[in-house]
């Protein structure tokens, strides 16, 4: 989805800085944007490291003078399986990218935006930030955390009377390679599925993503949300009823029921 956002921004003659931990993929994305007439720079970044986030901000300012839109979008599926079968490393690695990465991004970039009193932050959460499916505990934990961080940030900026906007992007199934991103782990690390339940969930997720929304549609949705200063951005309406049903279960103090898209 990040590349789709960059493509859409470049169509508006926005200067684009892309980041990725995979240098070859990053170079290909930068060359594509430039090949289509856009201005783009690439910075190899491990979002789980605070120092890399600081370097990304510095490189962006060095390249283009300022930063106006920040998209905290790095994503992996992470390890999946029974929550008690996952190792501490499984949790740590997934949360490091999905949650710590966003925390580092907020702490690094938001002060710059607040100081100039303009700009926008796009935080990529997920439907998994509102619905808890089984056998994906690290991902669910991270996305619930990211959603509440975005909402907290929104309230704080309003209290501060800042002109900086926030969008919380909550994708459903989008045709991306997020599952394959787990392969970027260091050699010898535990794979994405740690048990038979993980295998089943991985197969389901891959099928669902392959039939999911075109990332280019999401890129347009993000651009529109920024333009309209819209906070909640859900990529489709398939999960509206399940989210409402979960909220009602909480209000009624009833046991959770497994939710599926309508």
What is each residue range found by the language model?
Residues 1-17:
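Canonical Rossmann dinucleotide-binding motif of NAD(H)/NADP(H)-dependent dehydrogenases/reductases
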Residues 12-28:
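Conserved glycine-rich Rossmann-like NAD(P)H-binding loop of the short-chain dehydrogenase/reductase
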Residues 23-24, 44-56, 88:
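The beta1-alpha1 cofactor-binding region of Rossmann-like NAD(H)/NADP(H)-dependent oxidoreductases
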Residues 81-83, 87-93:
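Substrate-binding pocket helix/loop in short-chain dehydrogenase/reductase
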Residues 106, 142:
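Active-site helix of classical SDR
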């Amino acid at each position: 989805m990040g590349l789709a956002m960059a493509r859409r921004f470049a169509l508006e003659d926005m200067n684009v800085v892309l980041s990725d931990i995979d240098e070859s993929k990053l170079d290909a994305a930068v060359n594509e944007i430039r090949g289509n007439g856009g201005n783009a720079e690439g910075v190899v970044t491990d979002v789980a490291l605070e120092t890399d986030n600081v370097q990304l901000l510095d490189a962006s300012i060095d390249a283009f003078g300022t930063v106006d839109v920040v998209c905290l979008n790095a994503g992996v599926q992470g390890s999946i399986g029974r929550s008690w079968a996952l190792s501490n490393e499984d949790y740590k690695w997934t949360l490091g990218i999905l949650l710590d990465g966003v925390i580092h991004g907020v702490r690094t970039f938001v002060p710059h935006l607040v100081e100039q009193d303009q700009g926008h932050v796009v935080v990529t959460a997920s439907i998994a930030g509102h619905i808890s499916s089984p056998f994906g505990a690290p991902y669910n934990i991270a996305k619930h955390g990211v959603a509440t961080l975005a909402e907290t940030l929104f309230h704080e900026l309003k209290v501060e009377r800042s002109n900086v906007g926030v969008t919380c992007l909550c994708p459903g199934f989008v045709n991306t390679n997020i599952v394959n991103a787990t392969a970027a782990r260091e050699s010898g690390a535990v794979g994405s599925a740690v048990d038979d339940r993980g295998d089943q969930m991985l197969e389901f997720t891959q099928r669902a993503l392959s039939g999911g929304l075109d990332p280019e549609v999401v890129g347009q949705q993000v651009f529109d949300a920024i333009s309209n200063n819209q906070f909640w951005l859900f990529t489709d309406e398939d999960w509206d009823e399940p989210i409402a049903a979960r909220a009602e279960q909480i209000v009624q103090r009833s046991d959770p029921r497994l939710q599926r898209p309508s």
